[in-house]
Amino acid sequence: MAYRDQSLGELAIAIPRATKLFRELNLDFCCGGKQTLSRAAGKKDLNIDELEAQLEKLAAQPSDARDWREAPLADIIAYIIPRFHDRHREQLPELILMAKKVERVHHDKADCPHGLANQLTAIYNELSQHMMKEERILFPMIGQGMGANAAAPISVMEHEHDDAGRDVEVVKELTNGVVPPEGACNTWRALYSGINEFITDLMEHIHLENNLLFPRALRGE
């Protein structure tokens, strides 16, 4: 099957395991989910034939992941809040504490991620406000069947998702692609492992909203 003309968002929905592959290849399937596979691969100088072959293999594998394309929107919202919103509220305070410790203890090392704690704090504050607006305003509208009238708040949320994506890129720059240096202490390694987990969760979170929940809500489903 030819995947090159399909969008990253469509492929991430149709082939759940594709999100892991896209993350490994640094292909933005959440905020940049509307670009085609061919265009995204071209930007990264990836071999489109090899990429399609990898997706073919993933699509052929059985998956126990839920197919959200036909699920009631209320079910999607009920999944997003505990799986992503509550999880981010747990992840970020701990990551901020570890980042402060690493910056304090290793401030004299060349690879020290100076400014990381402040950047994570900014992400936490912005994301907390963002999720609160979704939970108090947008999600209730969608749950009450008013999604077709929610174009304005959805547009705001999508712009804030773009902002979050740019904030994550700053984190990657500060952390050498979130790769700990050789000889890094356990806290440093745990910090970067936790950041990678957070980024993976955030991308899945934004993908589910941008590419599935919001479009379906706007169609009045």
UniProtKB/Swiss-Prot annotation:
State the Gene Ontology BP annotations.
protein repair; response to nitrosative stress; response to oxidative stress
**Principal localization?**
cytoplasm
Record organism: Pectobacterium atrosepticum (strain SCRI 1043 / ATCC BAA-672)
| A UniProt-annotated Pfam family | ScdA_N
Q: Which InterPro entries match?
A: FeS-repair_YftE (IPR023742), Hemerythrin-like (IPR012312), RIC_family (IPR019903)
Instruction: List the protein's name.
Output: Iron-sulfur cluster repair protein YtfE
List keywords of the entry alphabetically. Cytoplasm, Iron, Metal-binding, Stress response
For this record, an example GO cellular component is: cytoplasm
Species classification: Bacteria, Pseudomonadati, Pseudomonadota, Gammaproteobacteria, Enterobacterales
Q: Which GO terms describe its molecular function?
A: metal ion binding
Query: What is the recorded function of this protein according to its Swiss-Prot or TrEMBL entry?
Result: Di-iron-containing protein involved in the repair of iron-sulfur clusters damaged by oxidative and nitrosative stress conditions.
* Protein localization: Cytoplasm
What binding partners and quaternary form does the record give? Homodimer.
